[in-house]
């Protein structure tokens, strides 16, 4: 909350709504993942992506959007901004697409904007949410940090949607029934 207050005092909006991402992580990986370093340099593709910070390690930040993850390269100008980020913050980045020495795609942080400040930072990747009780009580955190749980919910949602469409096509009527009510009947 202190960082949020400091951001407000500097005149910045902690929750701007003017950034429009043009690409997703999966789209970039699928479209440019097989390119060579030289081909990407020659292409000079500028991309715009938004995502949640899940790792922040010096020169590289890893962000996750709804489709996957991608690395961001922290330029010299972006270092103060990168140091102010916490795990869970959502950022918008515009910059050139490159290939690292290890063959991973990354976006150079030419333009950057904080879209949402995380009031409660996420657990780090190595420790995560190990306590089962905590995972159930903080389901939203579990969905953010655990891809297997997120995938389970995606599959469940698709199954429920399929059943609902099938029954609607057969002219069934959906009726909500209270299940967690204190008053019986």
Give short role names for the model-derived ranges.
Residues 1-185:
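Class II aminoacyl-tRNA synthetase catalytic cores and aaRS-like
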């Amino acid at each position: 909350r202190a960082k949020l207050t400091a951001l407000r005092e500097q005149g910045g909006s902690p929750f701007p709504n003017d950034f429009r991402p043009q690409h997703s992580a999966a789209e970039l990986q699928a479209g440019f993942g097989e390119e060579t370093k030289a081909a990407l340099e020659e292409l000079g593709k500028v991309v715009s992506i938004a995502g949640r910070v899940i790792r922040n390690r010096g020169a590289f930040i890893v962000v996750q959007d709804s489709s996957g993850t991608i690395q961001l390269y922290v330029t010299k100008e972006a270092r103060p901004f990168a140091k102010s980020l916490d795990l869970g913050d959502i950022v918008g980045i515009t910059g050139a697409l490159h290939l690292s020495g290890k063959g991973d795609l990354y976006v150079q942080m030419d333009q950057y904007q904080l879209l949402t400040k995380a009031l409660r930072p996420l657990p780090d990747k190595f420790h995560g949410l190990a306590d089962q009780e905590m995972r159930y009580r903080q389901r939203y955190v579990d969905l953010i940090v655990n891809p297997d749980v997120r995938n389970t919910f995606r599959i469940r949602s698709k199954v429920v949607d399929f059943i609902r469409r099938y029954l609607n096509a057969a002219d069934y009527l959906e009726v909500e029934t209270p299940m967690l009510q204190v008053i019986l009947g």
